[in-house]
Amino acid sequence: MSKKLIALCACPMGLAHTFMAAQVLEEAAVEAGYEVKIETQGADGIQNRLTAQDIAEATIIIHSVAVTPEDNERFESRDVYEITLQDAIKNAAGIIKEIEEMIASEQQ
C-alpha cells in the first residue's frame, strides 16, 4: 500500500501564505515518500479539490489553515492533523515526521 498525504491550505486573504504552505508541504511529503495532493482555498476559490476518494485513501490528512475551510464536513470521519500556516512553512518535514510517529505509537 502506498503512502498518501493530502492537505488543505487556506488563509483569510488566500494570496501568499496559502500557497507557500502548500508548496513546502508538498516538497516535504514527496521527500518523505508520499504521493501528495493539496487543495488550496484562496482568493481564486478552491483549487485542486480533494475528492471523497482522495480522503478515503489518505494515510495522513493535514489542514494548514487560518480560517475554517469550505466543505469541511468532508473530513468528519477521518483524523485530521491541524497546523498553522506558519508551522507548515517553517517546519513541514518535522511536522510530517511527528505525525508519522504519532500514528506509529497509536498502532502499537
Curated annotation (Swiss-Prot):
InterPro entries membership: Bacterial_PTS_Sugar_Transport, PTS_EIIB-like_sf, PTS_EIIB_2, PTS_EIIB_2/3, PTS_IIB_fruc
Domain spans labelled PTS EIIB type-2: 1-101
Keyword Transferase (UniProt): yes
Modified residues (Phosphocysteine): 11
Main localization, broad class: cytoplasm
Active site per database record: 11
Enzyme class: transferase
MF GO annotations: kinase activity; protein-N(PI)-phosphohistidine-fructose phosphotransferase system transporter activity; protein-phosphocysteine-D-fructose-phosphotransferase system transporter activity
Record keywords: Cytoplasm, Kinase, Phosphoprotein, Phosphotransferase system, Sugar transport, Transferase, Transport
Source superkingdom: Bacteria
GO biological process: phosphoenolpyruvate-dependent sugar phosphotransferase system
Subcellular location: Cytoplasm
Cellular component GO terms, alphabetical: cytoplasm; plasma membrane
Listed Pfam families: PTS_IIB
EC number, as in UniProt: 2.7.1.202
Its biological purpose: The phosphoenolpyruvate-dependent sugar phosphotransferase system (sugar PTS), a major carbohydrate active transport system, catalyzes the phosphorylation of incoming sugar substrates concomitantly with their translocation across the cell membrane. The enzyme II FryABC PTS system is involved in fructose transport.
Domain comment quoted from the record: The PTS EIIB type-2 domain is phosphorylated by phospho-EIIA on a cysteinyl residue. Then, it transfers the phosphoryl group to the sugar substrate concomitantly with the sugar uptake processed by the PTS EIIC type-2 domain.
Record's protein name: PTS system fructose-like EIIB component 1
